[in-house]
Amino acid sequence: MSPHDYADRRSESVTDAVTAMNLEPDRATDTPALNGGSTSLKDDTNGVSRSPSAQNMDVAVKSRSSSQTPVKKEEETSNTADMEEKVGGDITVKQEPGQPPKLTRSSSQKVVARPPQLFSHLRDSTAEARVSFELMDSCTYANKYMGYTEHAMECDCAEEWVSSVSGNILSMPISLYALEPALSKNLACGEDSDCINRATKIECVGDCGCGPDCQNQRFQRKEYAQVAVIKTEKKGFGLRAEADLRPHQFIYEYVGEVINEGQFRRRMRQYDEEGIKHFYFMSLSKGEFVDATKRGNLGRFCNHSCNPNCYVDKWVVGEKLRMGIFAERDIQAGEELVFNYNVDRYGADPQPCYCGEPNCTGFIGGRTQTERATKLSNATIEALGIEDADGWDTAVAKRPRKKKMGEDDEEYVDSVQPKSLEENGVTKVMAALMQCQEKWIAVKLLGRIQRCDDERVRNRVVKMHGYQILNSQLTMWKDDFNVVLQILDILDKFPRLTRNKIIDSKIEVTIQPLTSCGDERVEKRAATLLQVWSTLEVGYRIPRMKRDPNATAQAVNQFERRETIRDQRRRSKSRSRSRSRSIEAPRGPAAQTRGVYGQRNPHHHGPRSFRRQFNPLPTGWFAAESNGRTYYYSARGDTTWTRPTKPAPQPPPPPKESRDKALQDIIDGIMNAKENTPKEKSGTPGTPQVSKPIPVKKEGQEKWRGYSEDKQKKVYENTLFPHIKYVVDKFKHKLPKEDLKRYAKDVAKKLVNSDFKNNRVEDPTKISEKQQKKVKKYCKEFFDKAVLKHRAYEQRKYEKQAKGMDSKVETPQAPSDDEALDVKMSDDEEDKADEKDTPMTAEETQGGTKRKREGGIAEDSNLGEYISSSKRQRSSTPPPLPPISPGDDPQNMDNAKKILRDDIDSRSENNEFTPPPPPPPPPDDEMPSESPETDHAIDQSPSRAEYITDMNKLKSSQPEIEGKV
């Protein structure tokens, strides 16, 4: 005979008696379950079950044979006549003389520890199970407001990177870790950390300061455990762990269709009519449900158990509330993953429970389940300060009152005295309060915070996003003035340091309407609170850098990364909090350390190295060599063999009147050019061209169209630069390096501005071959004239020095429009065929008036710099020049003089002054004879050759040190 048949016969005799009995208050304990579930009514897998024929049975405990249920004889162990009969597990029927039978337990009902049942022998049925539903990666929502929750919270955790290879803590710029994700790992917001978001069940998103890829992004990264679907004997498909799991490890997200209550009830009836026996509804929040019946993921196969090894929890991810399955305890590979449906799992009819646990309630759902168990989750019970009976056995002498049959959860919680709130319990309270959807639970949780007088607890509440969570509760229950007063009282007791958290939570916007809500008490408290908050100061915080999630990291080669790591390590050592190594105390003389300086002076480490004294030349003097000897010269041509000790005489400044006249002429030319400039210009080419079909370009090839005009000009300048550099390289030995670089930039700017002004640029990322030729030709003409100008400048100065002229700079005259302009590209020099083919030449075929006008506009951009530079006092003049080469043509001297003045002005504006080329050395007869004093001075100073070499190096790198004017 099977034990199931034995249990069925036995249940018929005591069913009515058990249902009419009450548990003794001092012995009764229960197991939480949902929607009822009697501990005395069990299905055929676990023992006692209700029989339909048990209607007219009387209490027949005395007449029961000993073969069915052993009866203990109390007279053998005691003088009382009590009799007990064991029904099942720890539950017994106790009878006393003259008293009705009572149902009691010998001890508190605890689940007997036993080794976990493994299902490793069952084959993997994942592929077979996927046919029965549609697989989804994430939840779908009936509308965008379903599952919505406020999220504006950031944790205070800092990035904590560790090497994946060595395990050492690293401190490098975040960009380097983003480039090498396989070599590093961010340990911020880990399981053992004090992360505020993790404690309040909020996942970190991109705007948190903990950095990318922190440990609190399990839902977002879908860090699911290794599981497999198995086919069980009675429960259908189930979920099995394929690897060992640690407590509170994330296993799977419960994914499905998020629907409202109306859709939920319609689908309940629909599935019942379709003959679907297994429903997969989970309550997400008040009036919102997750339906994974027809669409979901593998998490839907997690079965029910009265002694579960998993639990379901809700987390805030971004602006959505999501549900996940987590490990309750250590789980071995091969165990079935089960959780208790007693909280929010729904079905049409009561379903028998086949978990086989000693504390099995018999049914998963339905009215036959006991009403003595609370429907609250364990997390909510802990947050309310109500512990189970087993925990109270050791905490207090008197056990708490258990829930009565038919008693509401709210009535039961009201009758139980909760524990006082402690600092380590704040996290659970705030997490439950953030997800609370029932008013009476919110009132109880707020009451625990309100009654607390410990300052540390209040600080902890503020730290755990207290202002944000209370703001959401205030918004939810703003129509109930009693709840509002409760929240305002809590806010009034919060510690007040700065307004930062108040501003971040935006709670002032929520409280402001309460000042005119109609309730006198609420209005007074709200106004007082806002007035007090307004007096607080805002603490300065370094703003957090917002990272663009779509931005791609720039490539960094291996050597640059090494250098950056070294620099970062040096800085981290200098910022290290660890105490630096202290200087060792003297331990007495040591033979090996004794030297010529003696043992009493520890600071002598050998002879002091010789330091060469650096005596710069006076202002306006320069040094040069001739046959190994050094002579000195000034900018105006004075030479001497003796080292000067006073600054060189400076030329007189130019007359102010001539300078003002030159500036006025430039301004008049610019104003006239603006008046004559046409408002609109036609971009139509001279000759109509045959339209060609525009090829469809792939997305991303024309990103430049979204750029601003300045950025497009920069792109176009980079496109032109290789062709400009080709010409510049040919003039390396004809012009000074600094002038060459400056001219290259100037010609690039002029070409870019001219082409954009005349609408010649169709694509700034490329130019045609004809345009390349035009650019090179223009650059060559520009630099040819620049070379001519440079040589004319040198020739003029050399002639002055040769004739012994008094060095005075001629007063600059106002250049005409043609002379003030730099070299322009001539349109007449282009081929006529090019004029017809390219729209570029069609715009350039206008007369010289247009060129002058463009030149005037070009000068306008530099007018401010020119005027400001005129106010500076020039204390140095251009140096003398070497003689002009015989092959140079001096006919352009007059024109070069005027261009020279512009060049001098531009040099002064840029604060650039290159040491002039040296003139011929002074006659040998002027060389001073060596005297004992001179010899003595030379002996005390470094060698003359070394000094001259250092001076030349210094002049090449920093010419303004000696030539500063």
UniProtKB/Swiss-Prot annotation:
Residues 225-342 form the SET domain. Residues 349-365 form the Post-SET domain. Residues 36-56 have a biased composition (Polar residues). PROSITE patterns: AWS, POST_SET, SAM_MT43_SET2_1, SET, WW_DOMAIN_1, WW_DOMAIN_2. It catalyses: L-lysyl(36)-[histone H3] + 3 S-adenosyl-L-methionine = N(6),N(6),N(6)-trimethyl-L-lysyl(36)-[histone H3] + 3 S-adenosyl-L-homocysteine + 3 H(+). Residues 615-646 form the WW domain. Coiled coil: none annotated. Residues 1-112, 549-615, 637-660, 674-706, 797-965 are annotated as: Disordered. Its EC number is 2.1.1.359. It comes from the Eukaryota. The keyword Cell inner membrane does not apply. Residues 150-223 form the AWS domain. Keywords: Chromosome, Methyltransferase, Nucleus, Repressor, S-adenosyl-L-methionine, Transcription, Transcription regulation, Transferase. GO terms for biological process: methylation; regulation of DNA-templated transcription. GO terms for cellular component: chromosome; nucleus. Histone methyltransferase that trimethylates histone H3 'Lys-36' forming H3K36me3. Involved in transcription elongation as well as in transcription repression. The AWS and SET domains are necessary for transcription repression. This is Histone-lysine N-methyltransferase, H3 lysine-36 specific. It comes from Aspergillus oryzae (strain ATCC 42149 / RIB 40) (Yellow koji mold). The gene is set2.
